[in-house]
């Protein structure tokens, strides 16, 4: 392809049972010359069959559809015809955001709430998201295994779980673990946290996610993690064995006293920003930091991880083979500041080793 040649339009299947919403969505997408709607489905069974026959570049999926629901359609599509999926969810309250989070765990690349009013800004962002994810290589997900993981209490209750009264961290005898993720992150984070039951250090996480789904992410992570998981609150003192998730649209940082600092000003394009977290850990934890950059689009976190590397912290990046999207880890890799590039299943053990090596033995 010559430098001036254009890609063919992104072929999209729209899954939406509301005639009004479906017509609006099709019109919004096809206002972009680089997007073409090639099929429309109103039920889960129609969606599964249509994706299998048309092999589109992208699927937009409503979760509230007949014949099994959007989660069922997603599981079947990702098990049999893996396709980049953008979930449009009308469930945005704290209690009802769980389906959108489970969709992300089950393989959807993005989840956004349906607007009450379709603004030009939302429509433009929607088209941009479709164009962005069209070229993502998605992996096959075993049917039903990933998205339904949180709903297996028998399995989760068998995991060792940290006491909810986690002790205040002793800065002289501990370290700080900072993790950043974007597209594909919830599944990767769950895999890592399940292997950190014995960790005696605080964990701070930046996950790029729509603000409406942040509380749902915390609730879901709390069900699958052996550690205590909380939404970060400004001024909190870091506690060993506690996982702090950045609130939606808010930067998560630590202070010199190892307290939580939340900043809601738009310092960077991303909010929360991985760079903001990593840079604060580099400044205030220095060689007692462990930085981890996971799957995700773009380059957020690369500069911050470089700062951690310069300060003597351990830096870890997910490898390409196990990343849903290799953008963020690759950006860090290109800077030459990654100490260990690892497949997802090996990252938890590397964090434990790194934390132990950075924790002084009391005399």
Where are these regions (language model features)?
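Conserved acid/base catalytic micro-environments in cytosolic active-site loops
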Residues: 1-11, 18-30, 34, 40, ...
């Amino acid at each position: 392809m010559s430098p001036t040649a254009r890609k063919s339009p992104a072929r999209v299947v729209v899954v939406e049972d509301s005639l009004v919403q479906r017509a609006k969505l099709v019109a919004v997408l096809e206002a972009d010359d680089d997007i073409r709607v090639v099929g429309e489905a109103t039920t889960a069974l129609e969606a599964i069959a249509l994706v299998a026959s048309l092999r589109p570049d992208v699927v937009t999926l409503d979760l509230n559809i007949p014949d099994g629901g959007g989660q069922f359609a997603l599981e079947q599509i990702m098990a049999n015809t893996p396709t980049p999926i953008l979930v449009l969810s009308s469930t945005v309250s704290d209690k009802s955001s769980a389906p959108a989070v489970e969709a992300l765990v089950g393989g959807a690349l993005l989840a956004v709430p349906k607007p009450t009013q379709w603004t030009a800004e939302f429509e433009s962002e929607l088209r941009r998201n479709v164009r962005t994810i069209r070229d993502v290589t998605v992996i096959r997900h075993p049917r039903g295994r990933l998205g339904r993981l949180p709903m297996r209490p028998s399995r989760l209750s068998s995991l060792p779980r940290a006491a909810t009264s986690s002790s205040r961290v002793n800065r002289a005898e501990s370290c700080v673990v900072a993790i950043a993720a974007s597209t594909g992150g919830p599944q990767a984070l769950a895999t890592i946290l399940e292997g950190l039951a014995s960790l005696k250090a605080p964990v701070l996480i930046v996950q790029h996610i729509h603000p409406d789904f942040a509380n749902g992410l915390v609730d879901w992570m709390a069900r699958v993690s052996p550690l205590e998981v909380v939404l970060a609150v400004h001024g909190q003192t870091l506690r060993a064995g506690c996982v702090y998730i950045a609130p939606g649209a808010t930067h998560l940082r630590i202070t010199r006293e190892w307290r939580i600092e939340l900043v809601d000003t738009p310092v960077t394009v991303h909010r929360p920003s991985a760079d903001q977290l990593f840079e604060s850990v580099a400044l205030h934890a220095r060689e007692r930091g462990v930085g981890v950059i996971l799957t995700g689009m773009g380059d957020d976190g690369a500069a911050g991880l470089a700062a951690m590397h310069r300060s003597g912290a351990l830096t870890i990046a997910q490898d390409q083979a196990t990343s849903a999207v290799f953008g963020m880890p690759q950006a860090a890799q290109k800077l030459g500041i990654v100490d260990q590039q690892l497949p997802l299943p090996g990252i938890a053990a590397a964090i434990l080793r790194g934390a132990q090596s950075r924790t002084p033995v009391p005399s």
